[in-house]
Regions:
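Immediate post-signal peptide segment of exported/extracytoplasmic ligand-binding proteins
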Residues: 39-46, 134-136
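Central regulatory/effector-binding core of bacterial HTH transcription factors
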Residues: 43-103
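Alpha-helix/helix-capping structural signal
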Residues: 52-53, 121-122, 145-148, 174, ...
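Hydrophobic hinge/microswitch elements
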Residues: 162-205
Length: 205
């Protein structure tokens, strides 16, 4: 088992500590750690928690390939923005989006991201967008869940004169991405979350 109960509450067992240290990198690295746990404790159930947009847009498209590598493993994926406590919530892996400021946890980076503007070719048709400054004349879509918003991003690029309200504001990245796919404006999003839409030619950076 991964956790054991003591007078101080739930604590990691030796196997649990080994598992957490092994979990790093992308899905193949998660898979290596999972395989080790299965061999050590014959566990056939992997419980994963992640943020909703990351779970839907990045993790889910890769789960089938992961399952093919470990066909006997049952996978449970729970998505929320809540802070997970491993002992309380019965979670094996928590995939978080942030700046690694979790001092009580063993944290490994799965993948670094880039935050870029994305839009559909339909929206860009007939619009002359050649520079960052040209974005000021466009419909910018805001997502509450991104670590970097339009205001900060434009300031970092030393773009001045931006003082407009967003026509569309969403609290989930997958909603912002879908709005951009529908030609409703330009989003500022993670290349990881928008990657599938780009590969399918629904969006372009």
């Amino acid at each position: 088992k991964i956790f054991s109960r003591s007078s101080k509450g739930m604590v990691l067992t030796t196997i649990g500590e080994k598992y957490l240290k092994e979990v790093s990198g992308a899905l193949n690295i998660i898979g290596q750690a999972t395989n080790q746990v299965i061999n050590d404790i014959h566990q056939d159930y992997l419980r994963i928690h992640s943020a909703p947009s990351f779970g839907l847009l990045w993790l889910m498209p890769r789960l089938d390939k992961f399952r093919q590598a470990w066909p006997e493993l049952k996978i449970s994926l729970t998505c929320s923005y809540e802070s997970i406590q491993f002992s309380r919530d019965n979670i094996d892996i928590d995939i978080r989006h942030g700046l690694s400021q979790w001092p009580t946890l063993v944290v490994k980076t799965i993948k670094n991201e880039r935050v870029l503007p994305f839009s559909s070719s339909t929206y860009l048709a007939g619009r002359d967008v050649q520079s960052i400054e040209d974005l000021l004349a466009c419909d910018l879509i805001h997502s509450d869940s991104t670590l970097i918003g339009w205001s900060n991003w434009l300031s970092w690029h030393k773009v001045r004169g931006w003082n407009k309200n967003f026509i569309f504001n969403f609290d989930r990245s997958y909603m912002s991405i879908e709005a951009a796919r529908m030609g409703m404006g330009i989003i500022l999003e993670s290349n990881l979350l928008a990657g599938q839409s780009v590969s399918q030619r629904h969006l372009e950076p």
